[in-house]
């Protein structure tokens, strides 16, 4: 796709992902912005029309924004509308959400859509009682899982290479504790890593962190 034709890019990614998934493959998509998640997620939904797909987003932001044009803030609202159009459930879990980085309208939409949320503070202070049960629920309840990781969920000190670095965030070691059981579940069908921006990186620090996450996913994925 040439230029800034986001809808065409979404459709091209959607078709490529659906083709791969129908061929028995899994998909790992790298960047750019979180708008990538709509094309990737829609392709997974298209490939498994009769199955329950759980969407797990590791992110400081809910990305359920109302907007006339698609952007990195709209992908999960777009996926919710896609699920509505396909007359299927929208099963969305967001882990690492910053209470300070989302408007009340986004919290209201999340409540209306019955989004399962684990805030960043809960990840840091109640991992065993809030995060692990949510992961276990997703693994038990859904036929397929789609994991999307916005790198701005990491603290700014570990991931400077994003447009909205997190003041608090979920540390890399903790993030990997979330990722590992999903990778080993046998249900993880698709993963993406998004929002890395090399223009904001410091001495390659963010690139190395992102590469380690990608390596661990490939290493653990069953």
Swiss-Prot record:
Q: Which family does it belong to?
A: Belongs to the arginase family.
Q: Which residues form a coiled coil?
A: none
Q: Give the source species.
A: Klebsiella aerogenes
Keyword flag DNA damage: no
Residues holding Mn(2+) 2:
59, 61, 150, 152
Kindly list the biological process annotations in GO that this record carries: L-histidine catabolic process to glutamate and formamide; L-histidine catabolic process to glutamate and formate; putrescine biosynthetic process from arginine, via agmatine
Role, per record: Catalyzes the conversion of N-formimidoyl-L-glutamate to L-glutamate and formamide.
Entry's cofactor comment: Binds 2 manganese ions per subunit.
Key words of the record: Histidine metabolism, Hydrolase, Manganese, Metal-binding
One Pfam match, given by its short name, reads Arginase
Q: What is its EC number?
A: 3.5.3.8
Q: Which PANTHER family does the UniProt entry name for this protein? A: ARGINASE/AGMATINASE (PTHR11358), FORMIMIDOYLGLUTAMASE (PTHR11358:SF35)
What is the primary gene name for this protein? hutG
Q: What is this protein called?
A: Formimidoylglutamase
